[in-house]
Amino acid sequence: MLTDITLGQYYPGDSFLHRMDPRAKILCTMIFICAIFLANNPWSYLLVTIFTLGCIMISGVPPVMVWKAVKPLWVILVFTLLIHVLTTPGKEIFGYGFIHISEEGLRNGLFMTLRLVFLIGFSSLLTYTTSPIVLTDGIEALLNPFRRFGVPAHELAMMMTIALRFIPTLLEETDRIMKAQSSRGADFTSGNLWQKAKGMVPLLVPLFIAAFRRADDLATAMEARCYRGGEGRTKMHQLAYTSRDRLAFTTVFLVTAVLLAMYFYFRT
């Protein structure tokens, strides 16, 4: 079901990750995502796996929720694996007709697929452990230095957060429309891929209408609360780095340093 997709949802809690400064969480997430692409051997992926699982345990977020964030993208993961397996030249381990699978292709395909899994899973922890309001404040604070160049930091942060928050809302709306049309005899499951795609076309009009209606309701609610952008806006909670943020930065930098060392060691 579309409602099983958890991207953009917040999981309330009081864990170490929940209490971190949003700026620290965003920066640590970006650093670790970049570090994932340094993994080029089984030992590196073992370290990435241990670190990711450790963060999931510390966050208090059920592992099944992290899996739900990865599961909807299984088509992309399988496609990525097949592309590498079937197109990478090297020592052949299987061949049949025009299909040739090499040892290098299998390794590269598995590594790239694992990178995507860790990237999606670790990124989902950011939204699971950070409420939309706090996430907006964190993004705005990180973009503030660019305001001198004319970058509207608050407006960009607000748009990004609203877009992320609307993903589960639109998926829920799509699921509701599909159920309503199925009760009237519509069939979204039978037929080939093209027929299923054509069957989704009638969903577009009511979905767009519902999306614009929700956007209008949100705009009305923001105006009713006298929202006028970031100028002169005060915050109930002031952002401040604490010892837990410094500990998180230290841990992420250590993991990145180890991955970088293993990258050059196994590369040679």
Regions found by a protein language model. Name each.
Residues 69-77, 113, 117, 207, ...:
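Loop-to-transmembrane-helix entry motif
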Residues 25, 64-74, 248:
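Alpha-helical transmembrane segments and their helix-start/interface "positive-inside/aromatic belt" motifs
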Residues 1-44, 48-57, 141-144, 148-151, ...:
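Transmembrane alpha-helix interface motif
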Residues 14, 37, 60-65, 96, ...:
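Membrane-helix interfacial "entry" motifs
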Residues 51-61, 76-79:
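Alpha-helical transmembrane segments and their membrane-interface exit regions
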Residues 41, 45, 60-64, 88-96, ...:
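Transmembrane helix-loop junctions in multipass membrane proteins, especially transporters and channels
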Residues 73-186:
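Juxtamembrane/interface alpha-helical elements of multi-pass membrane proteins
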